[in-house]
């Protein structure tokens, strides 16, 4: 690499690294993901996202005003051709404590899922169960997963389009049995930034298609839709994510989230008009004799059109 290219590479890496660290720090602070004394189990798949998560968390560990442990964990699911030496060599170099778990979930998935069908759903459930159980064994107080902002938004639309639910991936989650807290430190990070970061850092990526599973076509379609929006309408994806953080149950239609049944008007409220009219002169009657016009100051006159049955 020439000196000029090397300088550009370093400049871009530093800029991107700063942004990602800031976003991860903000997500952790906003959702209180990591606390003093935590033992964080960082789940590694060998993909770009989990590598970036471990890298950023290790940097944060050195700079944060609190003390917490990091234990990297990878689950070898016995997929054909899985390069067993890559992750141990990488983690040894980092000098981070780690565990490589071995469990043949691949055979279970191949036995249960018909040939040519997507295996990702069952595979992820089996993987989650194994990792949750191991977290309890090692006394982990938090389980860190590498899902990013795009994953969260895609999941929202997948559940809307195909599940009839307004449901995404929360940045912080208590497992159904109450035994584990799952955190997603990359919740504010864009996938394209993580892709570039992985290239610049030259992480030893392990391909995710070793199982031979077909691509999840529904998720791929949603991803394509969002990418098209991002190209055509810059800022739309950011607005969607902001909207997900600003929900108003009373303005929706979900009876489980808001008690519409018990809504009662307050007969004692003064007749001052609706909040939307707060900036307009208040009035409490219509001057029928004057064709519906109410005589106010000329500069503030309001025309009120009324219809009356004969």
UniProtKB/Swiss-Prot annotation:
Annotated motif PP-loop motif, positions: 45-50
Catalytic activities: cytidine(32) in tRNA + S-sulfanyl-L-cysteinyl-[cysteine desulfurase] + AH2 + ATP = 2-thiocytidine(32) in tRNA + L-cysteinyl-[cysteine desulfurase] + A + AMP + diphosphate + H(+)
Keywords from the named record: 4Fe-4S, ATP-binding, Cytoplasm, Iron, Iron-sulfur, Magnesium, Metal-binding, Nucleotide-binding, RNA-binding, Transferase, tRNA processing, tRNA-binding
EC number: 2.8.1.-
Binding-site residues for [4Fe-4S] cluster, renumbered to this chain: 120, 123, 211
Cofactor(s) for this UniProt protein: Mg(2+); [4Fe-4S] cluster
Subcellular location: Cytoplasm
Pathways per UniProt: tRNA modification
Subunit structure: Homodimer.
Family: Belongs to the TtcA family.
Comment field (misc): The thiolation reaction likely consists of two steps: a first activation step by ATP to form an adenylated intermediate of the target base of tRNA, and a second nucleophilic substitution step of the sulfur (S) atom supplied by the hydrosulfide attached to the Fe-S cluster.
Record HAMAP family: TtcA (MF_01850)
Protein name as annotated: tRNA-cytidine(32) 2-sulfurtransferase
Taxonomic source organism: Shewanella sp. (strain W3-18-1)
